[in-house]
C-alpha cells in the first residue's frame, strides 16, 4: 500500500519494517494451527478461482507471496503487487528458491493499480482490506482490473474479531505498537462490489473461535473437532471469521 492516500497510515510503516517482513510468515503460519490456516487458505483459493492454467492472475497486497505461489503452482501466470519493498524482497527470494518463474513481483498500491481495465482473469487480495486506509477505493481498483473474478477476505463484524479490533484500535490510539484493523459486515462488502458491477458468488467462513485461542491451545485435532462441532450447532454461518468470498462481474 502506498501512492497517495494517508501515507502516514500505520500500514505503510508497519509493513516496510524489515523485521516485520522477516518474521511475517513465522508469526502467522508457524505451528500446527498456522499450518492449518495456510493449507485451508490455499484450498479455498483454489476452489474459488477454478481452472487457472495459463490464465493471468493478479495478487494485490501479496506480502511474502503466499497466495501468488499457490496460483503459480496451479499453472497461472501471476503478477504480485505490494507497497512494501521489504515484503517483496522476501517473496522474490522464496520464489527463486522454489524455481517459480511465472510470477512477476512489482511494487504498487492497492488504491491506484497501474494496470489497464480488465487486465486479469481474476484478482486476489487476502488480508489487505482490513488494513487499507481507503478500503472502498481498493475494492473499486480490484474490480476495475478484473475481467471476471475478485477474491478477498475480511474479519467479520459479527465475530469475536470485532472485540479484538476494538482493543487494537484503542491500543494504537494510546500510542502502543500494534496492528489495528477494521471489521466488515456482509452488507458493507456486498454494497462495495455491487457499486462496481460485481455480485458475490460464494463465501467461506473459517473459525468461530478466535485464531489466537486456537494458537494458544496449539492442537490441530482440537481445532478441527471444536470448529466442526460449532458448525454443526449452526454457529459458523453467523459468527465465522475470517470470511473469504469470490465476486463475479455481472453480465453487461
Which ranges hold each PLM region?
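A conserved beta-strand element that flanks and buttresses the S-adenosyl-L-methionine
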Residues: 124
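Conserved class I S-adenosyl-L-methionine
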Residues: 2-52, 54-63, 149-173, 225, 229
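A short glycine-rich, Lys/Arg-flanked "PGG" loop and its adjoining helix->strand segment in the class I
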Residues: 136-149
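Acceptor-substrate binding/catalytic loop of class I
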Residues: 171-188
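Class I SAM-dependent methyltransferase SAM/SAH-binding core
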Residues: 64-111
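A C-terminal cap/extension of S-adenosyl-L-methionine-dependent methyltransferases
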Residues: 167-168, 201-252
Amino acid at each position: 500500500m502506498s501512492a497517495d492516500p494517508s501515507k502516514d497510515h500505520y500500514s505503510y510503516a508497519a509493513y516496510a519494517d524489515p523485521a516485520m517482513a522477516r518474521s511475517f510468515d513465522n508469526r502467522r503460519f508457524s505451528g500446527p494451527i498456522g499450518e492449518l490456516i495456510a493449507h485451508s487458505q490455499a484450498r479455498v483459493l483454489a476452489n474459488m478461482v477454478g481452472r487457472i492454467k495459463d490464465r493471468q492472475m493478479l495478487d494485490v497486497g501479496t506480502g511474502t507471496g503466499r497466495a501468488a505461489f499457490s496460483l503459480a503452482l496451479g499453472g497461472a501466470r501471476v503478477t504480485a503487487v505490494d507497497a512494501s519493498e521489504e515484503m517483496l524482497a522476501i517473496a522474490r527470494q522464496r520464489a527463486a528458491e522454489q524455481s517459480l518463474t511465472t510470477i512477476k513481483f512489482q511494487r504498487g498500491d492497492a488504491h491506484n493499480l497501474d494496470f489497464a481495465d480488465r487486465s486479469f482473469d481474476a484478482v486476489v487480495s487476502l488480508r489487505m482490506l482490513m488494513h487499507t486506509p481507503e478500503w472502498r477505493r481498493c475494492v473499486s481498483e480490484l474490480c476495475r482490473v478484473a475481467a471476471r473474478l475478485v477474491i478477498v477476505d475480511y474479519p467479520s463484524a459479527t465475530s469475536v474479531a470485532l472485540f479484538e479490533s476494538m482493543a487494537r484500535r484503542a491500543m494504537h490510539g494510546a500510542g502502543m505498537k500494534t496492528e489495528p484493523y477494521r471489521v466488515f459486515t456482509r452488507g458493507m462488502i456486498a454494497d462495495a462490489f455491487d457499486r462496481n458491477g460485481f455480485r458475490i458468488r460464494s463465501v467461506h467462513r473459517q473459525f468461530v473461535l478466535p485464531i489466537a485461542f486456537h494458537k494458544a491451545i496449539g492442537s490441530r485435532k482440537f481445532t478441527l473437532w471444536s470448529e466442526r462441532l460449532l458448525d454443526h450447532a449452526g454457529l459458523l454461518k453467523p459468527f465465522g471469521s475470517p470470511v473469504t468470498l469470490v465476486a463475479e462481474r455481472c453480465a453487461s
